[in-house]
Amino acid sequence: MLKIIIPTIMLLPTALLSPKASLWTNTTTYSLLIATISLQWLNPTYFPHKNMTPWTGIDQISAPLLVLSCWLLPLMLLASQNHLQQEPLVRKRTFIVTLTTIQPFIILAFSATELTLFYISFEATLIPTLILITRWGNQPERLSAGIYLLFYTLISSLPLLVTILHLHTQIGTLHMPTLELTHPLLTHSWTGTLSGLALLMAFMVKAPLYGLHLWLPKAHVEAPIAGSMLLAALLLKLGGYGIMRVTLLMGPLTDRLSYPFLALALWGALMTSSICLRQTDLKSLIAYSSVSHMGLVIAASMIQTDWSFSGAMILMISHGLTSSMLFCLANTNYERTHSRILLLTRGLQPLLPLMSVWWLLANLTNMALPPTTNLMAELTIMIALFNWSTPTIILTGLATLLTASYTLFMLSMTQRGTLPTHLTSIHNSNTREHLLMTLHIFPMLLLMLKPELISGVI
Amino acid sequence: MAAGAGGRSAAEAYRPNRYVSLPAELDPAAYDASPEKRRAEAERLAIRSQLKRQYQLQLNDPHRPAVIEDPALIRWAYARTQNVYPTFRPTPKTSFLGAVFAIGPILFWISVFKADRDRKEKLIKEGKYKRPLSLF
């Protein structure tokens, strides 16, 4: 573990002290090296739980997320090179420092064995993300986006802090392997119910659950590309991961408490998929599709069966990669047309045929085409939900149908159709962009061959 | 034009209906335009040609801007994305829509899931829950 965390922290001096000519090269290759070292965590010889240091440990539901977070940092650096080209050197360094500050906190969050440490690192990822969105976003709406992100997360996590401290005094420890051995503390009283709600709410806002998702379209749309990738691929998964960890504390409460969350998550998946069909903003469409997929993850995490956790894990990883890739593709559009309006970014297939291959692949994985891992995940979740309660199949089936329809809508709007008349020339896709897309799709294709790596079971 | 079946002329056979509006060539009123209509047409033509002139000025400018913006499109996109909440007002229609599509279905699905789960729990407690795919 130290061989990942110490290099990640050392990435900060690298970004601050590298000479100008090799700033991007140094940071990108260094983070790629850290990412390849982190792949060793996928090796399943140490499970069910490997204690690496007294405060961090991995098991099979945190290992894939850790590898994803390490893998994404070089991709974020690759994606940001273009829009930072014109900036002075100091600002480039500041940007890279902000990005790399989030990294150790995310690694700590996913590998924390103590619930308090998880909470601290969960909150600590907020500040650099806020800086990223409000400083480097492109539109004046980024200020309200930052405020929504900050206050939604903070308001919902204050009860979480109170409940964590209260549980610590009651149980005596919050070490997660030990917690599995204690008897459940929460009862069906008002105190117990409110404690359970408080434990869950912060992660429901982060995941996001349908009623609490308002920060997400704003934050995703106004963030720069690295911020969008980070949010979509990692910070949302913090919410899903938190729900999985916290429900082991909640004992008998989930019998009653799971109903509203399940209904909100599944109906929200339907509603946000339908909103996607009416979007005019490309990034907003991808953001709402994130809400839809994470709704399925929340629903699966609330029913707490083996299969549903496994499906939620696979969906989190595959959605992380797919959503990040879609945001990168939307960003390549944005860098050329400086507009996110769908009507203005049409007809790209004759113009940029190689990029349209990546568009096609990203959209095919987004709509859960067999044999991608997205399909494995969605099927597992649908079956687990069906076993839990039969009428859920209506909601999940409709959600899958609407997902396919808005994905095809996005594909046909951006690739086919009349060419934009107001543009005279667009730059050809460069190797950096193709490399970025390759590095996104390559893990997804490989994981198709061995999905046990991310499926959360031994 | 050849007379159709029943001896109707083309103008009588092809009246506008719900799916198809009358094309301008078949509309007799297109040829005797009243002065108000002609003034309105002239105004619309003036607006269109001004917009076209602005567009072509930018298009043929030697120092052309990289992207020629359409202000109408920008206003439309702004109205659809960022101006929704400030222009929202609770009316009977919007309250009804919110209740039917947001609050109602949540309560409905909560009750459906709870009823189904309680039914299953009762069957399990009575020992009557069939598990046809069980491995035991």
UniProtKB/Swiss-Prot annotation, chain A:
Topology of the protein relative to the lipid bilayer: Multi-pass membrane protein
Disulfide bond positions: none
Recite the UniProt keywords alphabetically: Electron transport, Membrane, Mitochondrion, NAD, Respiratory chain, Translocase, Transmembrane, Transmembrane helix, Transport, Ubiquinone
- Its predominant location is mitochondrion
* EC numbers, comma separated: 7.1.1.2
- The answer to whether the entry has keyword Transit peptide is no
Q: Which GO terms describe its molecular function?
A: NADH dehydrogenase (ubiquinone) activity; ubiquinone binding
Q: Name one Pfam family in it.
A: Oxidored_q5_N
Q: What does this protein do?
A: Core subunit of the mitochondrial membrane respiratory chain NADH dehydrogenase (Complex I) that is believed to belong to the minimal assembly required for catalysis. Complex I functions in the transfer of electrons from NADH to the respiratory chain. The immediate electron acceptor for the enzyme is believed to be ubiquinone.
In terms of NCBIfam families, this protein maps to: NDH_I_M
Q: What is the designated name of this protein?
A: NADH-ubiquinone oxidoreductase chain 4
Originating organism = Struthio camelus (Common ostrich)
Which gene is the coding source of this polypeptide chain?
A: MT-ND4
